Amino acid sequence: RENGIDSLAYYLARKLKNRTAAGYRAYLLRGLRQKSRQYPLYEYRLSYADYKEIREFPFFRLGRNIGGLYEREMVQRQKLFGSLASRTIGDIYNEIETGGLSKGKNGLELRYDTLLHGKPGYNSIVRVGGRWTNVVEEEPVDGLDIRTTIDLQIQDLTEKALVDKLQEADAASGVAVVMEVKTGEVKAISNMERIRPGVYAELRNHALADELEPGSTFKIASMMVALEDGICTPESPIDVGNGTYKFNGRTIRDHNAQSGGYGTITVAQSIWYSSNVSIAKIVLKGYANNPRKFIDGLHRTGIDADLNLDIAGAGHAKIRQPGDPQWSRMTLPWMSFGYEVQIPPINTLAFFNAIANNGRLMRPMFVKSILKNGKELRVYEPEVLIPEICSKRTLRAVQEMMYNVVNYQDPVGRRDGTGKPARSSVVSIAGKTGTAQIAASKAAHNLSFCGYFPYENPQYSCIVVISRPRRGIVSGGMMAGTVFKEIAEKVYSNQIRYDLSSMKPEASRTLMPPVKNGESRSAQAVVKWFDIRTTPKRVDADFSAFWRNATRDTLNVRKLTVREGMMPYVIGMGARDAVYALERCGLRVNLAGHGRVILQSVPSGQAVTRGQTIDIILN
């Protein structure tokens, strides 16, 4: 029927915006004349809210049998915070299975799929009193919820620090993971991969899946084994000569071989300076005639332990054994400084976390609890995999070496540790740099830094890996160490709790009290009581919502720009002001937490539509 088709075309054009009203009219008439059983109306996905609105358009409101509107249902995993821990959280398949349920595809969505998707209900159609009636045979059961260990603040700053460096270095991919030392809870995990110049996204869980040759971070495990077996002490001298060492016809080189090498140094300094020659000589001295003993020692450290992770597709650490087809006379020395082994970044982090945790190797945790309707059904406790990876004496020696990798300052100024770029005046950091040449290309490298902070009372461990950078200095310290430093400083600063009772007021002047972004007139009433200046001195009556910038003694006020169809910036606002600003744009708001807004689900300046729901997190 062509009757009323003009009205339908008008409504479709106004709603879908992919054709004009005239274009829709011609398209619909063409389908009508073809007399096809199926004729696609709109080839893109629609939200359920939009679909419900379209069902009420002319023709379609008459129902399926007369109006002829049919739909294909699909589901999509909505991630309110974009790429944050996206690959770890996981995805679901778009197709809907029998019973109206979807299925986990990867990440935690796949691992906990049977708990998350619930159970479908069943009904039958029976004839009652001359009418057909639906009878529920089995009620559907809602799926459970999981509470992850991810800290949104730490995750956000970790991802930003990583992406900034990847863009600066034009690197192929990068990993950054932050773990809580005492529990093994993963507080942040970012896996970013270049999809086009300057743009990075989470496509693969590199932190768990990539079985990499770790390079010099592995020297810590080699040193731990040698110290534990009494092969050397931290003070033992070792001659690395000019930075080259020939063994079985191949040459082992230090990074400074071209400038003459380190000469005679101590065993501890071989870690500070990351000497390949030194660690190879130590391992050959102790294990050349019994390599099995060295391999057994590595197993005891837990660096290749089965972590039994919650995420499907996680890789496994691989350490060659004497007698393996790939074992050669060069395997032992090359293994000592991180080649001919494959270690996923999460394993390296768990090992370094154990060093920070007084020798206890913790299982990395991604899930805290299982919930139903907000109530915890099961709480996951921290799990110790190895109570003691080495003796306390060896542990203290290794901890001190890692501290000096970052913080040792040569009085002459020529031999600072390789981790100097990670040195911080805000928080004390201990760690180890890693630079590993990728076998497939002599020009490509994986650059890493792994460690913990603060050194005196470790709270967090962290690993950063930058893969295949095209720009910048090929150095684990310069590339990954600087990212580690930024993460550590920001995480530590956010954790500081000041003792206000010990602070004395400054007698000479009044300091600006904390003022949130938002409505300014209330703030002005408070600061006026403190006799604090404001600019401008007066606020127009119609100015209701404002951004502010509080300096030491002045409250600066300017009008909040709220544009139709554009997401405003509400970071830093209190709940009332954020809701006010968003609702002025015609948006709906979901809030979580208390305090100031720290995250908004749609970035400021991005296009939004009236009625769209925005999620904000306060802390």
Residue locations for each model-derived region?
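Acidic/histidine-enriched alpha-helical segments
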Residues: 21-34, 171-183, 238-242, 312-317, ...
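Second-shell loop/turn segments in exported
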Residues: 1-2, 9-13, 36-45, 74, ...
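C-terminal, active-site-flanking charged/polar segments
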Residues: 454-462, 466-505
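Conserved, well-ordered alpha-helix/loop/beta-strand core segments that scaffold catalytic motifs
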Residues: 131-174
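Ligand-recognition elements built from short beta-strands and adjacent flexible loops
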Residues: 319, 426, 486-619
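Small/polar-residue-rich segments within soluble enzyme cores
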Residues: 7-14, 23-141, 463-464, 482
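Short, well-structured beta-strand/strand-turn elements
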Residues: 64-70, 168, 586-596
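Beta-lactam-recognizing serine transpeptidase/beta-lactamase-like catalytic domain environment
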Residues: 125-137, 150, 174-215, 224-469, ...
